[in-house]
Amino acid sequence: MISFGGKQLSESNEEIVESLKSLGMTRNLATTIAYLSNVKEASSQEIEMSTGLRQPEVSVAMREMRENSWISVHNEKVTGKGRPTKIYSLTTPFAKIIKHYEEKIREENEARMRIINKLKTLAK
């Protein structure tokens, strides 16, 4: 079970993650989106600690979210030496992310139906 900030993932958020996965989204991406939709912003480390995902899993999810322009990223200087921490926030409304998957699935299904219709024609 996933925990957000030490708390168990709420039943509705768990259902969101499972529903997103059933649309073809990876578990890591679904979990990260569910987490970011519940906070204003978070560092990669905060996401890791709150969701139980490993650093590479969060990085892959963030890359996909950046490619889709669903998040914004800014650097926050840390005290002392070292690289600044990247802070992520979800900038695309959750409904728009769902719309993206709705359109993707619709296109896939239309392509399948064209193949089925072609096969019906060939079978005559």
Which residue stretches match the model-derived regions?
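Short alpha-helical segments that sit at the start of domains
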Residues: 4-30
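Short, cationic-aromatic polyanion-contact patches
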Residues: 18-28, 43, 76-98
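Short amphipathic alpha-helical elements of helix-turn-helix/winged-helix folds
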Residues: 34-39
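A short acidic, leucine-rich amphipathic alpha-helix
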Residues: 46-50
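Key DNA-contact positions within bacterial/archaeal DNA-binding proteins
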Residues: 56-57
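Glycine-centered, phosphate/nucleic-acid-interacting loop/turn motifs that mediate DNA/RNA or nucleotide
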Residues: 69
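Amphipathic alpha-helical dimerization/coiled-coil segments
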Residues: 92-124
